[in-house]
UniProtKB/Swiss-Prot annotation:
This protein's UniProt keywords: ATP-binding, Hydrolase, Iron, Iron-sulfur, Metal-binding, Nucleotide-binding
Biased composition (Low complexity): 1-18
Species the sequence originates in: Methanococcus maripaludis (strain DSM 14266 / JCM 13030 / NBRC 101832 / S2 / LL)
Protein name: Iron-sulfur cluster carrier protein
Binding site for ATP: G48, K49, G50, G51, V52, G53, K54, S55
Gene Ontology CC terms, in alphabetical order: cytosol
HAMAP family assigned to the protein according to its UniProt record, in alphabetical order: Mrp_NBP35
Region described as Disordered: 1-20
Keyword Nucleotide-binding appears in the UniProt entry: yes
GO biological process: iron-sulfur cluster assembly
CDD domains registered for this protein in UniProt: Mrp_NBP35
One Pfam family cited in the UniProt record for this chain: ParA
Amino acid sequence: MAEECSGNCDSCGSSSDCSDTKKMMEQQNAQIRDNMSKIKYKIAVMSGKGGVGKSTVTVNLAATLNMMGYKVGVLDGDIHGPNIPQMLGVDQIQPMADENGIYPVSTPQGIKTMSIGYFLPDKNTPIIWRGPKASGAIRQFLSDVNWGELDFLLIDTPPGSGDIQITTLQAIPDIDGVVIVTTPEEVSVLDARKSVSAANTLEIPIIGIVENMGGFVCPECDKVIDIFGKGGGEKAAKELNVFFLGRIPLDIKARVASDRGVPMVTMDCKASEEFKKVVNTVLERIKKE
């Protein structure tokens, strides 16, 4: 629809274009509904700001569920920062496609993934897209990707609460809820509060808040040191009447694993232990709904 649209279709020379676009959107919505109907739980992972470990939480939530025997898919909705392929060690693989749609790239463990990162010529190529084009790509991943039957689809959304995030959340029929990721410091917690408000405005259930980087595990003594402060996520959860899912500490072992494309939950470390507790709490929460 043109930016100067008066709302009077009878006097508009572009009304046929609008009509065609509307039909295409309706067809795409129908395809999204059909695709998503084969997936039991749809969970979005959000953050109010970048750099808090949202993608790390998404990847390890997926890996833990996969280790528990669930069929899991991950949609990398962070169009301008598509890191999921590298974090799962499948960044050298390209998706296949035929008349039935685009097929997700599967990890050796069987986690299905889709990301704009698979379609870039190299890792240094930026995505210089405005909001509508980026939103359209996410809708296409929901409609055209042949996800098949899954127990869980996790959507790694872009940071913030703008048009791309809204389009993503509203495009998913019967979304089961959002997990909001923050770090302990006040600036991050402030942005997490905005994510809570955005989810409430869109009437999407909030599964809970995860406090990532909740302390640093000393590699010498294994003691957790609160270098970013302590308890900011839990405090915000109480004030906002949102469930607190747990704290994930920074762990050098986890960082090394992530750089190699290996989820931290496969490692023997404190971060892995705490993350598995978070996942069990998420399962309890969604199965109560």
